[in-house]
Protein backbone atom coordinates (compact mmCIF):
# COMPACT_ATOMS: atom_id res chain seq x y z
CA UNK A 1 0.00 0.00 0.00
CA UNK A 2 1.27 3.47 -0.87
CA UNK A 3 2.07 5.71 2.09
CA UNK A 4 3.61 9.11 2.76
CA UNK A 5 6.92 9.09 4.61
CA UNK A 6 7.01 11.90 7.21
CA UNK A 7 9.89 12.64 9.58
CA UNK A 8 7.94 10.87 12.34
CA UNK A 9 7.07 7.81 10.27
CA UNK A 10 4.74 6.69 7.51
CA UNK A 11 1.10 7.77 7.31
CA UNK A 12 -1.70 7.09 4.87
CA UNK A 13 -2.10 9.83 2.23
CA UNK A 14 -5.58 10.78 3.44
CA UNK A 15 -4.09 12.03 6.74
CA UNK A 16 -2.03 14.79 5.11
CA UNK A 17 -4.84 17.33 4.87
CA UNK A 18 -4.10 20.64 3.20
CA UNK A 19 -0.45 20.61 2.24
CA UNK A 20 2.16 23.23 1.36
CA UNK A 21 4.42 21.50 -1.14
CA UNK A 22 7.42 23.85 -1.19
CA UNK A 23 8.54 25.47 2.05
CA UNK A 24 11.59 25.89 4.25
CA UNK A 25 11.63 26.21 8.03
CA UNK A 26 15.41 26.51 8.35
CA UNK A 27 18.16 26.95 5.76
CA UNK A 28 21.27 28.95 4.93
CA UNK A 29 20.57 31.36 2.06
CA UNK A 30 23.62 33.59 2.52
CA UNK A 31 24.99 32.54 -0.88
CA UNK A 32 22.38 34.82 -2.45
CA UNK A 33 23.36 37.90 -0.46
CA UNK A 34 23.63 40.99 -2.65
CA UNK A 35 25.46 44.19 -1.58
CA UNK A 36 22.93 46.89 -0.68
CA UNK A 37 22.48 50.02 -2.80
CA UNK A 38 24.79 52.76 -1.42
CA UNK A 39 21.83 55.00 -0.57
CA UNK A 40 20.34 52.37 1.78
CA UNK A 41 23.47 50.66 3.09
CA UNK A 42 23.00 51.68 6.73
CA UNK A 43 19.31 50.71 6.77
CA UNK A 44 20.01 47.26 5.30
CA UNK A 45 22.91 46.60 7.64
CA UNK A 46 20.77 47.44 10.66
CA UNK A 47 18.64 44.95 12.56
CA UNK A 48 15.25 44.32 10.96
CA UNK A 49 12.68 46.60 12.61
CA UNK A 50 9.64 48.66 11.69
CA UNK A 51 11.95 51.47 10.58
CA UNK A 52 14.01 49.22 8.28
CA UNK A 53 11.40 46.71 7.10
CA UNK A 54 10.44 48.76 4.05
CA UNK A 55 14.02 48.64 2.79
CA UNK A 56 14.26 44.89 3.48
CA UNK A 57 11.07 44.25 1.51
CA UNK A 58 12.54 46.10 -1.47
CA UNK A 59 16.00 44.51 -1.17
CA UNK A 60 15.45 41.23 0.75
CA UNK A 61 18.76 39.71 -0.31
CA UNK A 62 20.78 42.76 0.77
CA UNK A 63 20.11 42.23 4.48
CA UNK A 64 22.49 39.68 5.97
CA UNK A 65 20.15 39.20 8.90
CA UNK A 66 17.29 38.42 6.53
CA UNK A 67 19.09 35.64 4.64
CA UNK A 68 20.33 34.00 7.86
CA UNK A 69 17.24 31.84 8.03
CA UNK A 70 18.82 29.46 10.53
CA UNK A 71 19.65 31.33 13.74
CA UNK A 72 17.72 31.07 16.99
CA UNK A 73 15.45 34.02 16.21
CA UNK A 74 14.55 32.56 12.82
CA UNK A 75 13.74 29.14 14.29
CA UNK A 76 11.56 30.66 17.00
CA UNK A 77 9.69 32.76 14.42
CA UNK A 78 9.26 29.78 12.08
CA UNK A 79 7.80 27.66 14.89
CA UNK A 80 5.32 30.41 15.74
CA UNK A 81 4.18 30.52 12.12
CA UNK A 82 3.87 26.75 11.80
CA UNK A 83 1.52 26.88 14.81
CA UNK A 84 -0.49 29.62 13.08
CA UNK A 85 -0.61 27.47 9.96
CA UNK A 86 -2.00 24.60 12.04
CA UNK A 87 -4.54 26.92 13.69
CA UNK A 88 -5.83 28.04 10.30
CA UNK A 89 -6.37 24.54 8.93
CA UNK A 90 -2.95 23.50 7.67
CA UNK A 91 -2.14 19.81 7.80
CA UNK A 92 1.29 19.18 6.27
CA UNK A 93 4.42 20.95 5.07
CA UNK A 94 6.92 19.60 2.54
CA UNK A 95 10.36 20.89 3.62
CA UNK A 96 12.50 21.32 0.50
CA UNK A 97 15.91 22.03 2.06
CA UNK A 98 18.43 19.71 0.39
CA UNK A 99 22.22 19.23 0.48
CA UNK A 100 23.81 22.66 0.05
CA UNK A 101 21.10 24.50 1.97
CA UNK A 102 22.19 23.04 5.33
CA UNK A 103 18.98 21.17 6.05
CA UNK A 104 18.15 21.09 9.78
CA UNK A 105 16.50 17.72 10.32
CA UNK A 106 16.68 18.03 14.10
CA UNK A 107 14.55 21.19 14.00
CA UNK A 108 12.12 19.72 11.45
CA UNK A 109 11.54 16.72 13.72
CA UNK A 110 11.07 19.00 16.74
CA UNK A 111 8.49 21.05 14.83
CA UNK A 112 6.58 17.95 13.78
CA UNK A 113 6.42 16.75 17.39
CA UNK A 114 5.53 20.09 18.97
CA UNK A 115 3.04 21.46 16.42
CA UNK A 116 1.17 18.40 15.17
CA UNK A 117 1.88 19.38 11.55
CA UNK A 118 3.12 16.55 9.33
CA UNK A 119 6.57 17.32 7.88
CA UNK A 120 8.04 15.57 4.86
CA UNK A 121 11.80 16.11 4.48
CA UNK A 122 13.68 16.03 1.19
CA UNK A 123 16.98 14.67 -0.01
CA UNK A 124 18.85 15.77 -3.13
CA UNK A 125 21.29 18.51 -4.07
CA UNK A 126 20.98 22.25 -4.48
CA UNK A 127 23.16 24.11 -7.00
CA UNK A 128 26.83 23.15 -7.36
CA UNK A 129 28.09 26.52 -6.09
CA UNK A 130 26.60 25.78 -2.65
CA UNK A 131 28.12 22.31 -2.16
CA UNK A 132 31.01 21.58 0.18
CA UNK A 133 34.04 19.50 -0.78
CA UNK A 134 32.43 16.24 0.33
CA UNK A 135 29.54 16.62 -2.13
CA UNK A 136 30.78 18.82 -4.99
CA UNK A 137 32.33 16.03 -7.06
CA UNK A 138 29.80 13.23 -6.51
CA UNK A 139 28.96 11.00 -9.47
CA UNK A 140 25.46 10.00 -10.57
CA UNK A 141 25.96 6.60 -8.93
CA UNK A 142 27.10 8.15 -5.64
CA UNK A 143 24.16 10.55 -5.63
CA UNK A 144 21.73 7.73 -6.37
CA UNK A 145 23.12 5.70 -3.47
CA UNK A 146 22.84 8.71 -1.14
CA UNK A 147 19.24 9.53 -2.09
CA UNK A 148 18.21 5.90 -1.77
CA UNK A 149 19.87 5.64 1.65
CA UNK A 150 18.19 8.81 2.94
CA UNK A 151 14.78 7.47 1.92
CA UNK A 152 15.09 3.74 2.63
CA UNK A 153 17.58 3.54 5.52
CA UNK A 154 17.21 7.04 6.92
CA UNK A 155 19.53 9.28 8.94
CA UNK A 156 20.35 9.35 12.64
CA UNK A 157 18.83 12.35 14.42
CA UNK A 158 19.32 12.41 18.20
CA UNK A 159 19.63 8.64 18.28
CA UNK A 160 16.54 7.97 16.19
CA UNK A 161 16.12 7.15 12.51
CA UNK A 162 14.51 9.85 10.36
CA UNK A 163 13.67 9.05 6.74
CA UNK A 164 13.27 11.49 3.88
CA UNK A 165 10.01 11.29 1.96
CA UNK A 166 10.91 12.68 -1.46
CA UNK A 167 13.84 13.91 -3.56
CA UNK A 168 14.09 17.68 -3.59
CA UNK A 169 14.63 20.34 -4.10
CA UNK A 170 17.04 19.41 -6.89
CA UNK A 171 18.35 22.78 -8.07
CA UNK A 172 20.26 23.95 -11.12
CA UNK A 173 21.57 27.08 -12.80
CA UNK A 174 21.49 27.67 -16.56
CA UNK A 175 23.28 26.44 -18.55
CA UNK A 176 22.98 23.47 -16.22
CA UNK A 177 26.26 22.59 -14.47
CA UNK A 178 27.53 19.01 -14.95
CA UNK A 179 27.15 18.37 -11.21
CA UNK A 180 23.52 19.50 -11.40
CA UNK A 181 22.90 17.31 -14.44
CA UNK A 182 24.16 14.39 -12.35
CA UNK A 183 21.74 15.29 -9.56
CA UNK A 184 18.80 15.47 -11.99
CA UNK A 185 19.76 12.13 -13.55
CA UNK A 186 20.19 10.52 -10.12
CA UNK A 187 16.75 11.79 -9.11
CA UNK A 188 15.26 10.22 -12.23
CA UNK A 189 17.01 6.90 -11.64
CA UNK A 190 15.97 6.60 -8.00
CA UNK A 191 12.43 7.79 -8.74
CA UNK A 192 12.08 4.94 -11.23
CA UNK A 193 13.25 2.43 -8.62
CA UNK A 194 11.42 3.72 -5.53
CA UNK A 195 8.40 5.48 -7.02
CA UNK A 196 8.88 8.51 -4.75
CA UNK A 197 8.10 12.13 -5.54
CA UNK A 198 10.70 14.55 -6.92
CA UNK A 199 10.83 18.36 -6.76
CA UNK A 200 12.91 20.39 -9.22
CA UNK A 201 14.18 23.98 -8.90
CA UNK A 202 14.82 25.54 -12.33
CA UNK A 203 16.98 28.57 -13.01
CA UNK A 204 15.24 31.84 -13.77
CA UNK A 205 15.03 31.40 -17.55
CA UNK A 206 12.20 29.90 -19.61
CA UNK A 207 14.34 27.17 -21.21
CA UNK A 208 15.46 25.70 -17.88
CA UNK A 209 12.34 23.67 -16.92
CA UNK A 210 12.23 22.04 -20.37
CA UNK A 211 15.89 21.00 -20.17
CA UNK A 212 15.47 19.64 -16.63
CA UNK A 213 12.52 17.50 -17.66
CA UNK A 214 14.42 16.13 -20.65
CA UNK A 215 17.30 14.98 -18.44
CA UNK A 216 14.97 13.60 -15.78
CA UNK A 217 12.76 11.66 -18.20
CA UNK A 218 15.75 10.25 -20.09
CA UNK A 219 17.08 8.93 -16.76
CA UNK A 220 13.84 6.99 -16.21
CA UNK A 221 11.87 9.31 -13.93
CA UNK A 222 8.10 9.47 -14.16
CA UNK A 223 6.64 12.83 -15.14
CA UNK A 224 3.57 12.35 -12.94
CA UNK A 225 5.78 12.10 -9.83
CA UNK A 226 7.78 15.25 -10.60
CA UNK A 227 7.06 18.82 -9.49
CA UNK A 228 8.50 21.79 -11.37
CA UNK A 229 8.85 24.54 -8.78
CA UNK A 230 8.87 28.33 -9.12
CA UNK A 231 7.03 28.49 -12.43
CA UNK A 232 5.40 31.76 -11.37
CA UNK A 233 8.84 33.44 -11.79
CA UNK A 234 10.07 31.33 -14.71
CA UNK A 235 7.45 30.87 -17.46
CA UNK A 236 5.27 33.97 -17.74
CA UNK A 237 3.53 33.28 -21.06
CA UNK A 238 0.46 31.10 -20.55
CA UNK A 239 0.72 29.48 -23.99
CA UNK A 240 4.33 28.50 -23.26
CA UNK A 241 3.28 27.20 -19.85
CA UNK A 242 0.57 25.09 -21.49
CA UNK A 243 3.20 23.70 -23.85
CA UNK A 244 5.39 22.81 -20.87
CA UNK A 245 2.41 21.19 -19.12
CA UNK A 246 2.22 18.63 -21.94
CA UNK A 247 5.29 16.98 -20.40
CA UNK A 248 3.01 15.77 -17.59
CA UNK A 249 4.68 17.04 -14.42
CA UNK A 250 3.07 19.12 -11.68
CA UNK A 251 2.89 22.87 -12.30
CA UNK A 252 3.78 24.59 -9.03
CA UNK A 253 3.07 28.22 -8.18
CA UNK A 254 5.02 28.52 -4.96
CA UNK A 255 5.85 32.18 -4.44
CA UNK A 256 2.50 33.27 -3.02
CA UNK A 257 3.08 36.25 -0.76
CA UNK A 258 6.03 37.52 -2.79
CA UNK A 259 4.90 40.85 -4.20
CA UNK A 260 7.63 43.38 -4.91
CA UNK A 261 8.56 46.36 -7.06
CA UNK A 262 11.22 44.26 -8.78
CA UNK A 263 12.67 40.78 -8.45
CA UNK A 264 16.13 41.21 -6.97
CA UNK A 265 17.43 37.80 -8.16
CA UNK A 266 16.41 38.52 -11.76
CA UNK A 267 15.89 42.22 -12.39
CA UNK A 268 15.17 41.62 -16.08
CA UNK A 269 11.67 40.34 -15.26
CA UNK A 270 8.76 41.63 -13.20
CA UNK A 271 7.54 39.39 -10.38
CA UNK A 272 3.83 38.74 -10.78
CA UNK A 273 1.38 39.54 -7.97
CA UNK A 274 -0.80 37.15 -5.99
CA UNK A 275 -3.76 38.36 -8.03
CA UNK A 276 -1.97 37.42 -11.24
CA UNK A 277 -1.02 34.05 -9.76
CA UNK A 278 -4.69 33.38 -9.03
CA UNK A 279 -5.73 34.46 -12.53
CA UNK A 280 -3.11 32.17 -14.10
CA UNK A 281 -4.21 29.22 -11.98
CA UNK A 282 -7.80 29.82 -13.07
CA UNK A 283 -6.68 29.79 -16.72
CA UNK A 284 -4.88 26.50 -16.12
CA UNK A 285 -7.94 25.05 -14.38
CA UNK A 286 -10.07 25.99 -17.39
CA UNK A 287 -7.57 24.13 -19.58
CA UNK A 288 -8.27 20.95 -17.62
CA UNK A 289 -5.08 20.98 -15.55
CA UNK A 290 -6.55 21.12 -12.05
CA UNK A 291 -5.03 17.70 -11.27
CA UNK A 292 -1.55 19.04 -12.10
CA UNK A 293 -1.48 22.20 -9.97
CA UNK A 294 0.24 22.84 -6.62
CA UNK A 295 0.54 25.95 -4.42
CA UNK A 296 3.02 27.12 -1.79
CA UNK A 297 5.05 30.13 -0.54
CA UNK A 298 8.73 29.03 -0.62
CA UNK A 299 9.46 31.01 2.55
CA UNK A 300 13.25 31.27 2.90
CA UNK A 301 13.91 34.72 4.42
CA UNK A 302 12.94 36.16 7.79
CA UNK A 303 10.92 39.10 6.46
CA UNK A 304 8.22 36.72 5.22
CA UNK A 305 7.53 35.41 8.74
CA UNK A 306 4.89 37.18 10.85
CA UNK A 307 7.39 38.05 13.60
CA UNK A 308 9.18 40.17 11.01
CA UNK A 309 6.09 41.73 9.44
CA UNK A 310 5.51 38.99 6.87
CA UNK A 311 2.59 36.82 5.80
CA UNK A 312 3.59 33.46 7.33
CA UNK A 313 2.81 29.91 6.23
CA UNK A 314 -0.96 30.42 6.59
CA UNK A 315 -1.16 33.11 3.87
CA UNK A 316 -2.57 30.82 1.18
CA UNK A 317 -5.21 29.43 3.53
CA UNK A 318 -6.35 32.72 5.04
CA UNK A 319 -5.85 35.19 2.18
CA UNK A 320 -5.51 33.41 -1.17
CA UNK A 321 -8.14 30.67 -1.07
CA UNK A 322 -10.96 33.13 -0.19
CA UNK A 323 -9.97 35.24 -3.20
CA UNK A 324 -10.00 32.14 -5.38
CA UNK A 325 -13.52 31.33 -4.20
CA UNK A 326 -14.54 34.92 -4.97
CA UNK A 327 -13.31 34.43 -8.54
CA UNK A 328 -15.30 31.28 -9.12
CA UNK A 329 -12.94 28.48 -8.13
CA UNK A 330 -14.94 25.70 -6.47
CA UNK A 331 -14.24 23.99 -3.16
CA UNK A 332 -13.75 20.74 -5.08
CA UNK A 333 -11.05 22.35 -7.23
CA UNK A 334 -9.30 23.87 -4.21
CA UNK A 335 -9.33 20.51 -2.43
CA UNK A 336 -7.84 18.91 -5.55
CA UNK A 337 -4.97 21.41 -5.62
CA UNK A 338 -4.24 21.61 -1.88
CA UNK A 339 -5.12 18.10 -0.66
CA UNK A 340 -5.43 15.48 -3.41
CA UNK A 341 -2.57 16.53 -5.69
CA UNK A 342 0.02 16.71 -2.88
CA UNK A 343 -1.09 13.31 -1.60
CA UNK A 344 -0.86 11.75 -5.07
CA UNK A 345 2.59 13.23 -5.60
CA UNK A 346 4.02 12.19 -2.22
CA UNK A 347 2.54 8.69 -1.90
CA UNK A 348 4.75 5.72 -2.78
CA UNK A 349 5.51 2.19 -1.61
CA UNK A 350 9.05 2.26 -0.12
From Swiss-Prot:
Disulfide bonds: none annotated. Its cofactor is a divalent metal cation. A divalent metal cation 2 binds at residues 169, 201, 230. It comes from the Eukaryota. GO terms for molecular function: hydrolase activity, acting on ester bonds; zinc ion binding. Its EC number is 3.1.-.-. InterPro entries: AryldialkylPase_Zn-BS, Metal_Hydrolase, Phosphotriesterase. One of its GO terms (biological process) is catabolic process. A divalent metal cation 1 binds at residues 22, 24, 169, 298. Keywords: Hydrolase, Metal-binding. Binds 2 divalent metal cations per subunit. The keyword Protein biosynthesis does not apply. It holds the Pfam family PTE. Belongs to the metallo-dependent hydrolases superfamily. Phosphotriesterase family. This is Phosphotriesterase-related protein. It comes from Drosophila sechellia.
Amino acid sequence: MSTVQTVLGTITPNLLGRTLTHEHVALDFEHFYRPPPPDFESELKAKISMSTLGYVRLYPYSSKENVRFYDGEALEAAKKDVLLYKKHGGGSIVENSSYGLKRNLEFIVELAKSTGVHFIAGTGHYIHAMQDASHGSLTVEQMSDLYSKDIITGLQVNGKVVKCGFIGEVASVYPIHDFEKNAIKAAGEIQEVLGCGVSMHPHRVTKAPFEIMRLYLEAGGRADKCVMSHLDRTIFDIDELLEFAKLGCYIQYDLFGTECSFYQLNTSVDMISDGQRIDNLIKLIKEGLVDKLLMSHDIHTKHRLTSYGGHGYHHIHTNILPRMFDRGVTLEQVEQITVTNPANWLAFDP
